[in-house]
Regions:
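Globin-like tetrapyrrole-binding proteins
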Residues: 1-154
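Glycine-rich, flexible loop/turn motifs
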Residues: 13, 35-39, 84-86, 181, ...
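Generic structural "secondary-structure junction" signal
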Residues: 19, 41-45, 83, 90-92, ...
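Short alpha-helical basic/polar micro-motif
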Residues: 30, 100, 186, 278-281
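Glycine-rich His-Gly loop
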Residues: 37, 195, 273
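FNR/FR-type flavoprotein reductase catalytic core
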Residues: 120, 234-393
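Ferredoxin-reductase
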Residues: 147-248, 302-304, 331-333
Length: 393
């Protein structure tokens, strides 16, 4: 329990963190990785290079300062981050390292303004927050390891099939190398894949959505090939060009909070852009299998037909459903965007909406859904990468 004095001091630093947060977290990561380069085997280097991880951490630290009196308010974000940590293999022993370099970064950036009183308050606050993460993640590790066919950290999987889904997306079907089955996962969850890429100094970790409904014998991930000059492209290009049937890759157990309530039978809309279609595939197939009478809408936006993955699969599942509407738009054609008018025509605002795609796409769709009268509790969305904030207007 934090003292009133500590909470007051931490809250008073919120405006400073809003102004200097990203600078602090940039210094933090730079100094921590210089002292502990082994941690680069865990973190996504591309997110570091693009500044996304720094911004995400700054947002989290700021939110903790604002809500220090009621940390329950940031519990959804904590659970989301903890899922990512468990997927990546973050351990309790890493938290003191993070705390040390975060405090040093605050002092380095703020200088004399970071008084001993402020640093002591933040040290206490970090201890409480880190303890909450450690306890939650320890419990999550136990659950994933103790579930049927579960494991913790990473396990070898064999590529048993490789399928081109579009000009940009390729699916990899993965089975445990030891011949065991895979655990049941929730539609919408992801796995982490850890790659030792020739020429790269550190391991590369990436999260990919499971793109088919849960089945006992295999996982399927569907990977978009990023541009050659994109920092995110290192892993995807390696997978597309060098990982083939028979090869082994390291996989973590399914994780994530962007999941479908498979028992709910209220109207549901899946709205995706580009590779954001991948988690929707496991959700849509699950609805088709378990609740085929559920009123369902699937809206997808792609650049063109050659980049549109899973069209035949969606039509196959839709044919087994009683109340389904499936529509696609291509941005290289006239009227090729998901507009408010389209959403008003096809989305039942009394139900649930699941949104995934590029950030500008999600911002536009979510703003339209809110304007149509949907509550935030009805709208679910997933970022591919560190969580950011959806703009309100």
């Amino acid at each position: 329990m934090l003292s009133e004095q500590t909470r007051t001091i931490v809250k008073s630093t919120a405006p400073v963190l809003a102004e200097h947060g990203t600078t602090i977290t940039t210094v933090f990561y730079k100094n921590m990785f210089e002292a502990h380069p082994e941690l680069l085997n865990i973190f996504n280097h591309a997110n570091q290079a693009q500044g996304r991880q720094q911004a995400a951490l700054a947002n989290t630290v700021y939110a903790a300062a604002v809500h220090i009196d009621n940390l329950e308010a940031i519990l959804p974000a904590v659970v989301q981050i903890a899922n990512k940590h468990v997927s990546l293999g973050v351990k309790a022993e890493h938290y003191p390292i993070v705390g040390e370099y975060l405090l040093k970064a605050i002092k380095e950036v703020l200088g004399d303004a970071a008084t001993d009183e402020i640093l002591t308050a933040w040290e206490e606050a970090y201890g409480v927050i880190a303890g909450a993460f450690i306890d939650l993640e320890e419990d999550m590790y136990k659950k994933v390891e103790n579930q049927k066919d579960g494991w913790s950290f990473f396990k070898d999987f064999k590529v048993v099939n490789k399928v081109k889904e579009s000009d940009a997306i390729t699916s990899f079907h993965l089975k445990p190398a030891d011949g065991s089955n895979v655990p049941v996962y929730q539609p919408g969850q992801y796995i982490s894949i850890r790659l030792d890429i020739p020429g790269e100094k550190y391991l590369s970790n990436r999260q990919y959505s499971l793109s088919q409904a849960s089945r006992p014998d295999e996982f399927r991930i569907s990977v978009k090939r990023e541009a050659d000059n994109d920092p995110n492209g290192v892993a995807s290009i390696y997978l597309h060009d060098h990982v083939n049937v028979g090869d082994l890759v390291e996989i973590s157990a399914p994780a994530g909070v962007f999941v479908l309530d498979a028992k709910n039978e209220t109207p549901v809309a899946f709205i995706s852009g580009g590779v954001g279609i991948t988690p929707m595939m496991s959700m849509f197939e699950t609805v088709a299998t378990l609740t085929p009478k559920r009123p369902t809408t699937f809206l997808h936006a792609a650049r063109n037909e050659s980049l549109h993955a899973f069209d035949k699969d969606i039509q196959k599942h839709a044919a087994t459903m009683e109340n389904v509407s499936y529509h696609t738009v291509y941005s290289d054609q006239p009227n090729g965007f998901i507009t408010r008018e389209m959403l008003e025509q096809y989305v039942d605002i009394s139900g649930e909406a699941y949104v995934c795609g590029p950030v500008p796409f999600m911002e536009a769709v979510i703003q339209h859904l809110r304007a149509m009268g949907m509550e935030d509790s009805q709208i679910h969305f997933e970022f591919f990468g560190p969580a950011a904030a959806i703009k309100q207007d």
